C-alpha cells in the first residue's frame, strides 16, 4: 500500500523541462533530499547515497516518451 503518491503532468517548453530536471539534480547532489509541494504542503524525502537509476525510451508511431526513474 502506498503511503503517498504524487504525480504531476504539465506542458512545458523543452527549456522549462530541462530547468525542472536540473532543479531535481541540484537537490539530490547538494542536500540528499528531494522536496515536493502539493496543496500548500511541503514534503521532503531523504534519498540515500546509493540509488538505482532506470532510463527508458519508447518510440511509437505518433509519440515519444522518456522515463527517468530513481528507486532505493
Predicted stretch roles:
Residues 1-19, 24-26:
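Terminal, regulation- and interaction-focused segments at domain boundaries
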Residues 8, 32-54:
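Short, structured protein-protein interaction patches enriched in aromatics and acidic/basic residues
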Residues 17-20, 38, 64:
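Functionally constrained cores in energy, signaling, and assembly domains
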Residues 51-72:
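C-terminal edge-of-domain segments
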Amino acid at each position: 500500500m502506498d503511503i503517498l503518491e504524487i504525480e504531476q503532468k504539465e506542458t512545458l517548453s523543452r527549456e522549462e523541462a530541462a530547468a525542472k530536471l536540473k532543479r531535481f539534480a541540484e537537490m539530490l547532489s547538494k542536500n540528499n533530499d528531494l522536496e515536493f509541494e502539493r496543496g500548500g504542503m511541503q514534503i521532503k524525502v531523504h534519498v540515500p547515497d546509493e540509488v538505482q537509476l532506470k532510463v527508458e525510451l519508447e518510440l511509437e508511431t505518433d509519440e515519444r516518451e522518456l522515463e527517468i526513474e530513481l528507486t532505493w
